[in-house]
């Protein structure tokens, strides 16, 4: 088994407290509302939303995938960080055992820097290259931009 790590950084005009509320704490409600073609719905299968919680995300009609399950590893509201592991679903191939994600929002001027790290745990000696994860990164960035646009258009939301 190998582990391949990829890092991304994005910037936003939205400050960390507001962005974290929308992008992490209320994403299960907000994303299906603003991007139903991407995420149809999200549900908690076990847990209370904190570490150890198992969620099932059902993708929308526009997605190539049906669903994924992920386990929340940590939620740190004070430091605007969130980590979860993709543990089941058709986004996991026969070569990938799991994918762990870490996201941290850092204040930058009046906005944020979003730091994201993905750890792909492969089966056997399979190698994951950056181009293999590029499409997923682009979709995630597009979803992030939708959330950012929503917050810009709804200045009273998530304050």
From Swiss-Prot:
SUPFAM superfamilies on file: Bet v1-like
Entry keywords, A to Z: Allergen, Pathogenesis-related protein, Plant defense
The keyword Translocase is assigned to this record: no
InterPro entries: Bet_v_I/MLP, Bet_v_I_allergen, Plant_def-hormone_signal, START-like_dom_sf
Protein family: Belongs to the BetVI family.
PANTHER family registered for this protein in UniProt: OS08G0374000 PROTEIN-RELATED, STRESS-INDUCED PROTEIN SAM22
UniProt-recorded name of the protein: Major allergen Mal d 1
Source organism of this protein record: Malus domestica (Apple)
Taxonomic lineage of the native organism: Eukaryota, Viridiplantae, Streptophyta, Embryophyta, Tracheophyta
């Amino acid at each position: 088994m190998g582990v391949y790590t990829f890092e991304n950084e994005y910037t936003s005009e939205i400050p960390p407290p507001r962005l974290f509320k929308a992008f992490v704490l209320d994403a299960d409600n907000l994303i299906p509302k603003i991007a139903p073609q991407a995420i149809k719905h999200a549900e908690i299968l076990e847990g209370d939303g904190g570490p150890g919680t198992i969620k099932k995300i059902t993708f929308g009609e526009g997605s190539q995938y049906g669903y994924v399950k992920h386990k929340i590893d940590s939620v740190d509201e004070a430091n605007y960080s969130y980590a979860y592991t993709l543990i089941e679903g058709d986004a996991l191939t026969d070569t990938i055992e799991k994918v762990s994600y870490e996201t941290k929002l850092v204040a930058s001027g009046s906005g944020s820097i979003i730091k994201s790290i993905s750890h792909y745990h492969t089966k056997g000696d399979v190698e994951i290259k950056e181009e293999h994860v590029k499409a997923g990164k682009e979709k995630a960035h597009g979803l992030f931009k939708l959330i950012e646009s929503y917050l810009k258009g709804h200045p009273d939301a998530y304050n």
